[in-house]
Amino acid sequence: MKPKRVQGKIVIEFPSEDIAEVVYTSVLYEHVSVPYRRSRVNFRREGRRIVLEIEANDSSAMRGTVNSYLRWIKVALDVLNI
C-alpha cells in the first residue's frame, strides 16, 4: 500500500509589509533554485504574511522541506537585524 501524501500550511505574520517583502524576496531565490523531488511548495506573500503550503510524499520529506524554509526565513530575519 502506497503511503498517503502529507500536507501542511504555515502562515508567518511579520510586523510590517516591508519586512515581509524583504524576507519573501530573500527566500524566493532559494524557492526557485532548489529542486524538490519529494515535495511541492506554494510559497507566497499576502500583505504582512508569508504563506507556505506544502505537499510531500512522506513525513521525512515534509520535515526536511519545513526545516529548509524556516531556516531560510530565520537567516533573512537575522540579516535584517544586523
UniProtKB/Swiss-Prot annotation:
Gene3D superfamilies xrefs: Alpha-D-phosphohexomutase, C-terminal domain
Native source species: Pyrococcus abyssi (strain GE5 / Orsay)
Main location: cytoplasm
Entry-linked InterPro entries: CTAG/Pcc1 (IPR015419), KEOPS_CTAG/PCC1 (IPR053619)
Protein's name according to its UniProt entry: KEOPS complex subunit Pcc1
Function noted in UniProt: Component of the KEOPS complex that is required for the formation of a threonylcarbamoyl group on adenosine at position 37 (t(6)A37) in tRNAs that read codons beginning with adenine. The complex is probably involved in the transfer of the threonylcarbamoyl moiety of threonylcarbamoyl-AMP (TC-AMP) to the N6 group of A37. Pcc1 functions as a dimerization module for the complex.
Keywords of this entry: Cytoplasm, tRNA processing
Cell membrane as UniProt keyword: no
Family: Belongs to the CTAG/PCC1 family.
A single BP term in Gene Ontology: tRNA threonylcarbamoyladenosine modification
Cellular location(s): Cytoplasm
NCBIfam families for this protein: KEOPS_Pcc1 (NF040853), PRK14887.1 (NF011470)
Subunit annotation: Component of the KEOPS complex that consists of Kae1, Bud32, Cgi121 and Pcc1; the whole complex dimerizes.
Lineage top rank: taxon: Archaea
Presence of the UniProt keyword tRNA processing in the record: yes
Any one GO cellular component localisation term in the record: EKC/KEOPS complex
